[in-house]
A protein has these predicted regions:
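Proline-centered loop/turn at the N-terminus of a beta-strand
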Residues: 58-60
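Short glycine-rich anion-binding loops that position phosphate/pyrophosphate groups of nucleotides
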Residues: 43-46, 67-69
Length: 141
């Protein structure tokens, strides 16, 4: 399938916003529900945020660096964006699912792309069990 319908998202960075406007004028912009791909303009943090907030859409995300380093992003250049998206190599990322149970038995779950962190509001020691794919790796931390 050739991707044609793009949905553009940009970080608050002025350069990212400027390029979003340029791309939307050149390629048009689809509502996310009608898009075939998401174009994320920003840095690595924006890419991670875009991936997490758009998991339910199950769309490929093509990142273009308008941040500082951009390890997760493609370089910004003047080549045809549709051609670049269609020529890109796809990778699948499996998000992490974090489940936490409070002392009173209430369960909380969250999905994460890059990392999971826990914050406590008390000074008591935390009892943490780590399981990966249903197998206990650390019984108590």
């Amino acid at each position: 399938m050739t991707i044609q319908k793009l949905h553009f998202l940009a970080s608050e960075n002025n350069d990212a916003q400027k390029h979003k406007d340029i791309f939307e004028k050149k390629y048009g912009s689809c509502a996310i529900d009608g898009a075939e791909a998401i174009i994320a303009l920003g840095g690595d943090g924006f890419m991670l945020e875009t991936m997490k907030s758009n998991m339910d859409h199950k769309l490929p995300i093509f990142g273009i660096n308008h941040g500082s380093v951009g390890f997760l992003m493609n370089a910004s250049n003047d080549l045809d964006l549709i051609d670049r998206v269609n020529a890109s190599q796809s990778i699948t990322i499996s998000p992490l699912k974090m489940s936490a149970v409070t002392p009173d038995g209430k369960e909380h779950t969250a999905m994460a792309i890059n990392e999971v962190s826990l914050l406590r509001e008390m000074h008591q020691a935390a009892k943490i069990k780590i399981s990966i794919d249903g197998k206990v790796r650390i019984d108590e931390l």
